[in-house]
């Protein structure tokens, strides 16, 4: 039998998941059913992925509806901690970091934040922590941006760094959420998803983002 893991059932009631799987199986012809038996785990993974997509689409739509009727509002209450305990720290110190040691970064992240930190208007930056330790945008998904940057003029920038291979649906969803957060948070708050060269819609390449940050 084809079954869906408890992770999917956490999103939908088990009966709804079972009904969806039944509809999928009923839509298959004899040849496809035989193929499903031979490639059981492939079909299972495809069904799980589809359920995840439907769940995320429903959550995004419901989230937008709640915003439209003023049921969701932003409040400025999150604060930087006096000290942090990253799981792993970055191996080098980059100027203007908020803490003596910041969390681990990959080469692209380190390259970008080092360049941004060199801008004269940047007051400090912080490598945001994940897994309930750092700041996250609480929307139709929980999004932990890579960096928090504060300028000398009081502007707060959330920066999400992406490699060229990460132009997927998850990136697009984070752009929608990040831009919505920035529009609701007020003029001082910005969200940039940044690619080294070729950005997807709603994001920026690095030079464009850096030029914007230079003027904030």
Predicted regions and their residues:
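Intrinsically disordered, low-complexity, repeat-rich regions
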Residues: 3-143, 150-155, 162-216
């Amino acid at each position: 039998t084809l079954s869906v893991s408890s992770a999917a059932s956490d999103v939908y009631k088990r009966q709804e998941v079972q009904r969806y799987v039944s509809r999928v199986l009923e839509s298959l012809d004899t040849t496809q059913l035989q193929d499903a038996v031979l490639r059981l785990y492939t079909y299972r993974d495809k069904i799980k992925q589809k359920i995840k997509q439907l769940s995320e689409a429903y959550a995004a739509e419901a989230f937008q509806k709640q915003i439209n009727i003023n049921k969701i509002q932003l409040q400025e209450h999150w604060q930087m901690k006096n000290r942090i305990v990253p799981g792993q720290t970055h191996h080098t110190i980059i100027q203007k970091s908020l803490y003596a040691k910041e969390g681990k970064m990959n080469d692209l992240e380190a390259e970008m934040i080092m360049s941004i930190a060199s801008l004269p208007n940047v007051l400090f930056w912080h490598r945001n922590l994940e897994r309930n330790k750092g700041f996250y945008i609480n929307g139709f998904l929980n999004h932990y941006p890579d960096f928090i940057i504060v300028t000398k003029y009081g502007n707060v920038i959330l920066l999400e760094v992406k490699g060229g291979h990460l132009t997927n649906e998850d990136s697009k969803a984070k752009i929608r959420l990040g831009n919505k957060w920035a529009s609701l948070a007020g003029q001082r708050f910005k969200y940039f998803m940044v690619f080294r060269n070729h950005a997807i819609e709603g994001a920026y390449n690095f030079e464009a983002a850096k030029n914007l940050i230079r003027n904030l």
